[in-house]
Every structure is written in structure tokens, then in C-alpha cells.
């Protein structure tokens, strides 16, 4: 089989190509009154966030990793007039609540922009002051204090969530919160229209039109045989079952099992990758709270049912034993954030201490601020490459959240 542009058969294989999104003007459109609606707790300082992100990208390049940017790929995907028009229509359709019937005027505003300017503006959002429109609807008088026709997308620098590379394909995700739902439109157009991906037979295991929510932070590729997916506030059991059926029926798939792991519906446990992240053949960084529950969890292993067009589901309760079994290792080592200390662990978990990016077996990228966790990783034989993130972390995501692997070497 000809090698395609997507290949991710593990969490730990040597990373060759990664998708990032450089923080942009969308962060400057965060204001205190509307933080929660855009899923932020704080406002990063854009200049410093960009400097930190640039250093993150350079750190990856220094390790021989190709870095590609979502905003650039998106602009390169809409060069054809018809594609650009459809892209704008999809964005505006998803934004009807805020554009208040002003599609025509907004399209006129967009018509003056280059492809790259258009993508950047859609990501940044449109303030009402940017387009002088006559108030004609009652809802506009009532909603006059809301500052945007097009909401900013400040979460976009977390490229892990709107899509997920699995095997030679991707899921293009229906995001749980409306604030993030438009984000997966970009990858939809990239796969269909970018020269790097179009006509390359990249399977879409789930697309954004699915009625069921799923987010990439809940999707972990444990091996060429096994996926682990969190059942969380943002990822539904229905989406996981649909994904399993779609992957299992693919004639070229190598995946045989999906381990669905229920996690609490709280912001602390936002996604599975805030609870555990694979960093070596038998090692995981974990949220220390998992130790209280690890032998009493709802874990479901989904398998194809002996060649039939159906699945079978086996329930278990012990996380460590389940992971060791599906990874075919004697045991797995859980390395707790902040060494499990009641203070250090809570602080470093808030700062995404367990959200590490593995770039090859036993080598991870982490925030330098999580020094207790980083030293513990080193004590366990893990090579730790530290990056600064005083502003990036304000979005509540770590190096794994900020990256979407497109190609890893097989292990």
C-alpha cells in the first residue's frame, strides 16, 4: 500500500510531522465578560504567547520534526473561488446566532481579503465596530452589548481537539461546545482541497456532521492494534461506538480494540489526556486522582465480533491491568503529576503537568513550570525537554493539547 500523508499508529513513535496553530488576534478578542462562553479562565498576553509558541515550534524542529500550521494549510486549501465561497458559507452557517442575518454584508467585508487574510480574520473574529451596519432587528437592539458578529476562536491553538490522526486517517470532530464547533471546518477543507491531502485516500473515520460529540483530547492511539478513548463531558459513548464500527469495517485497518474509559464530567478531567498520557512503551503520566479510582472504573473494551458485522463489548474496572493487557506488557507504570503531593500535584495538574507530548519513546516535551513532575519523569528514565508556557498555559492546555501529530514512525 502506498504511504499516505497521515500515519499515526501510536502515541510514542518518532514524531515526523506535526500540525500547530500559532496564537493570533483571536486571543486579543478575549474580554472578561465573555471568557466563560469562549471556554477560557484568563486572558493570555498575545505577544508573549506567540514568543512561547514559536519556541515550542522551534524545539520540535530542532528534534527533526516538520512543523506545519493550520492557518497556512487552510488558506492554501481555498484558492479556488467555488471552494472559498463554500468555506465562507459553512463558517457563516455555523455562526448564525451572532451574525444576526447580516450574511451579505459580512461576505462583502470578506471579499476584500486575500485567502490568508480571510482565514486569519475568521479565526480572530469580527467585532461589530469593524462593519458599520444599520440596526434593523429587535434582537440587535437587545444584544447591542455583545461585541462580535463573528466570535473569535481562541481555542484554536489547541490543535489536538478538532481532529485526531488515527492510523492512516482522521476523525474530523463535532465539538461539544458551540464556541469550538467551527474549528473542525478548517481540517475538513484541508483534507478535501489541500494538495498535500486531497486525492490521497485519507479515510475520515468520523466527520463533523456526526450527531455525536467527540474531541481529540479524548482520543489516544496506544498501538497499531488499540485505541483508548475517554467517555467524558465532551466525548459521547455513541461517538466511540460509531468510530469503532467505522474503523473495524475498513479492510486496511490494523486496529482490533478500542478501550473506552469513563472519566468524571469536570473541567479538571476535561479530556482523557488530562488524566493520562502515554510516554513510553509501558509508562504513563497520570493525574494523581486516578489512584483513588483506578480499581473501580468503568472501562469497556470494544472488539470486532469474530469477523461478523458487529462488535462485542467487555467491561472491566481496573485501569492498570487493562492497559497492560492490551499493550501486551507485564505491567504499566503510572507516574503521578507533582508526585501525587496534595499541593504540588494540584498545582501542576492545573498547569497541565500530565499533558505531555511524546516525540519518541521515552522522550517528552513539557512545560518547565511543572518542575516536580519533570524531575520525577527524569528519575524514571524519561528524557524531558522543557518549554516555557506562562501565557500558553492560561488556555488550560499543555504540549499535547497544542499539537496534532500527522505522521509518526511505526514502532
Swiss-Prot record:
InterPro entries: Arg_deiminase. It is found in: Cytoplasm. GO terms for molecular function: arginine deiminase activity. The active site is at 401 (amidino-cysteine intermediate). Its EC number is 3.5.3.6. It comes from the Bacteria. Belongs to the arginine deiminase family. NCBIfam families: arcA, PRK01388.1. This is Arginine deiminase 1. It comes from Staphylococcus epidermidis (strain ATCC 12228 / FDA PCI 1200).
